[in-house]
Regions:
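N-terminal glycine-rich phosphate-binding loop for ADP-containing cofactors
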Residues: 2-3, 22, 74-79, 85, ...
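Gly/Ser-rich catalytic serine loop of serine hydrolases
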Residues: 100-106
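A structural preference for short, pocket-lining loop segments at secondary-structure junctions
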Residues: 14-22, 32-74, 85-99, 119-123, ...
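Short, exposed beta-strand/loop patches in secreted or surface proteins that constitute
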Residues: 8-11
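Small cofactor-carrier domains centered on a conserved lysine used for covalent cofactor attachment
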Residues: 126
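Short Gly/Thr/Asp-enriched flexible loops that form oxyanion-binding sites at enzyme active sites
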Residues: 65, 106-112
């Protein structure tokens, strides 16, 4: 006997009913899928021939989560809880058969099944935290009852995906069945349950792990303390913790009510709206209107790296990590040896944390070859230059590479600000020159700015984007302008920060406001970390800026124990009376009278200047879309994901309010400051950046 609808099939094989869901691409819990589960389970329960039920999915995965497109819309069809109740209250055992991923609502459905079987490659998780949400279909109440409060907290606040073997050890999965034999294995497991007379296991009725957690009253306080830095500013992790506290201390149904209340709080929050926006923006950023997905690319099987310093070594690690050999070229053996030693030390530190084996370290180091001869890059498919940020030096390198490297290979510059068009004039293959701006530390930071010159070919762009994806980066396309997307906006903020320094705000005042907003650090702490002497020369220094005076006093940042801040032996920063005196002296020379600069003004002038510059970047078509700017700032500069990026944040403030404030600050913004015509026009028309696709 078989019953079929558009997204499911129900068949009875012997005494086992098999309910198969088929809603490509990931069997998300849309209204038709929820209806299919409810109807299918009820039909199987009503069928006297069926003694047990297997819930399985066609395609590449089990239910991979909620249908995000339904968020914020009027509900259609049955509620997920109705389908879950049908499963949990079935008088016949229901077995979830898991392959691919059981994520979010998918795992929450599986948790309502009495037993769970999975293939070895399957993964389970509750990643709602990444969307600024919590598991809202009983996950916060059922998961702790299976794996315990501590493991549940860790899984839900990190959103991690757990492999089948670990799931079995945790009790999240009851049976591992052979790869490729899920259907037969799950049916066999169901028959085994019937033969052994195993009871119906309702997770909601399991209480032993909750009793154990009640015996550890310090558990939640310790978890909050241990993760305070990681959770700073986010709403969802705290709400997840409160839900697990409810699971431990309240009856199941009261815990569910708590979960629902806290879920709805998050669903209607700006934080979750921002994180969901970022989720889609990270998928949109790869789409380049005039470079379709089927654009031919260069097959990158060997990479050349010119420069083995901090950036060059970090970039090389990205390729070694994915099995692509790299030849690193330096001008001196000492620099080459030092660069390779730093790479090895980085890998060994990772191995000490248990994330790599000793064999992994040697395998990756084996893919890295050092050289002092550019000729060794002749057969590379992609060569990336990461030398000193000087135009003439870069052009000299590119001229040599053009003569050496095989035709058709891509020549890329890691420049953070210089003109790619000018660099390209040094070669005969201008169409093969592209910017690939990695962010430091390059082996850690997710962002890659791909910079398109006037003559850069679509093939070169497609190759650079594909390479970014291959090495695990998020690549955003930028046009040519000083600083590209990220650093150009950073400069606009820096101008305001420096101006407010000369109006009476101290570095720690400005940094403190931006830190409280959610950024990892402010501009002055960032300068101290990078080193104030970057681009500074003792020979040409004229005490004309606060930074020059600090460098002349050997206050060059964290590395010298002092910069804008004073640092102790552990590099903890504290306000510096020396810096304050220098600032006051500069103000006196300029005839400036110190005033109290409010926190509101600090935040608005810094952020609204960024927004204004972002609008100019859009006007000039340097960035394809506003969300690309947000992706750059979230992944390259630590802009808090729960704020959505500077352009999304502008929408939450209201573009009319942004323009009004910029007009009110007027001359304070600087003599050369102008409001973007695009920003002004969008404000007048009541538009939002997030509506610009």
């Amino acid at each position: 006997m078989a019953a079929t609808d558009s997204v499911s099939t129900l068949v009875v094989e012997g005494d086992i009913a098999v309910l198969t869901l088929n809603s490509p691409p990931v069997n998300a819990l849309s209204a038709p899928v929820r209806q299919a589960i409810l109807d299918g389970i009820n039909a199987a329960v009503a069928n006297p021939a069926a003694k047990a039920i297997v819930l399985i999915c066609d395609g590449r995965t089990f239910i991979a989560g909620a249908d995000i497109s339904e968020f914020g819309k009027a509900p259609k069809g049955p509620a997920l809880q109705d389908a879950q109740n049908a499963i949990e209250n079935s008088p016949k055992p229901v077995v979830a058969a898991i392959h691919g991923t059981a994520l979010g609502g998918g795992l929450e459905v599986a948790l309502c099944c009495h037993y769970r079987a999975a293939v070895p490659s399957a993964k389970c998780g509750l990643p709602e935290v990444n969307l600024g949400l919590l598991p809202g279909a009983g996950g916060t109440q059922r998961l702790p009852r299976i794996v315990g409060a501590e493991k549940a907290l860790d899984m839900m606040t990190t959103g991690q995906h757990v492999g089948a073997k670990q799931c079995l050890a945790m009790g999240l999965v009851d049976e591992i069945v052979p790869e490729g034999e899920l259907r037969a294995g799950a049916i066999a497991f169901a028959k085994k349950l019937l033969a052994e007379g195993r009871p119906l296991k309702k997770v909601r009725d399991s209480d032993d792990k909750m009793v154990a957690a009640r015996g550890k009253p310090e558990l939640f306080a310790e978890f909050r303390k241990a993760n305070a830095r990681k959770f700073r500013g986010f709403l969802a992790p705290e709400n997840i913790i409160r839900c697990v506290e409810a699971a431990v201390n309240l009856p199941f149904d009261e815990g569910l009510a708590t979960e629902r209340k806290l879920f709805l709080e998050l669903l209607t929050s700006t934080h979750s709206a921002a994180q969901r926006y970022v989720f889609f923006a990270e998928r949109q950023v790869w789409k380049i209107p005039d470079v379709p997905e089927d654009t031919p690319t260069v097959a990158v099987k060997k990479v050349g790296m010119v420069g083995a310093g901090t950036m060059g070594g970090g970039i090389a690690m990205n390729f070694a990590n994915v099995g692509i050999p790299v030849t690193l070229v330096e001008t001196k053996q000492e620099a080459l040896d030092r660069g390779l030693a730093v790479i090895r030390r980085n890998y060994e530190n990772t191995a000490k944390k248990g994330k790599l084996t000793a064999e992994d370290v040697e395998k990756r180091m084996g893919l890295l070859k050092g050289s002092m001869n550019l000729e060794d890059l002749a057969d590379c498919d992609l060569v990336i230059e990461a030398v000193f940020e000087n135009m003439q030096i870069k052009k000299d390198v590119f001229g040599k590479l053009d003569r050496i490297v095989k035709p058709g290979a891509i020549l890329a510059s890691n420049t953070s600000a210089l003109n790619i068009n000018e660099i390209a004039t040094a070669v005969s293959r201008e169409d093969g020159v592209v910017g690939m701006h990695f962010f430091s530390p390059a082996n850690v930071m997710r962002l890659l700015e791909v910079v398109r010159g006037d003559r850069t070919s679509k093939k070169a762009i497609a190759t650079a984007m594909q390479v970014g994806k291959k090495v695990g980066k998020i690549a955003a396309l930028s046009g040519v302008c000083p600083g590209f997307i990220g650093n150009r906006i950073l400069y606009a903020r820096t101008v305001q920060a420096q101006a407010m320094l000369m109006e009476g705000a101290m570095p720690w005042d400005i940094d403190g406001v931006l830190y409280d907003f959610g950024l990892p650090m402010g501009p002055f702490a960032m300068s101290d970390l990078a080193g104030l002497d970057i681009g500074w020369s003792k020979e040409t220094s004229k005490s004309s800026t606060i930074r020059e005076v600090l460098c002349e006093m050997d206050r060059r940042g964290q590395k010298t124990g002092a910069g804008y801040y004073d640092y102790d032996e552990k590099r903890n920063a504290k306000p510096s009376p020396v810096t304050e005196k220098i600032v006051r002296d500069f103000m006196a020379k300029a005839g400036a009278t110190p005033r109290v600069v409010s926190k509101e003004e600090i935040l608005e002038r810094c952020l609204f200047a960024m927004i204004n510059e972002g609008a100019k970047i859009l006007e000039e078509k340097i960035a394809i879309r506003p969300s690309d700017i947000d992706i750059v700032w979230i992944n390259g500069y630590g802009f808090p994901v729960y704020r959505g990026g500077p352009m999304f944040y502008a929408d939450t403030v209201g573009l009319k309010n942004v323009v009004a404030k910029l007009e009110a600050y007027g001359p304070k913004m600087g003599a050369s400051f102008t409001i973007s015509p695009l920003l002004r026009r969008m404000a007048e028309e009541g538009k939002r950046f997030q509506d610009v696709k």
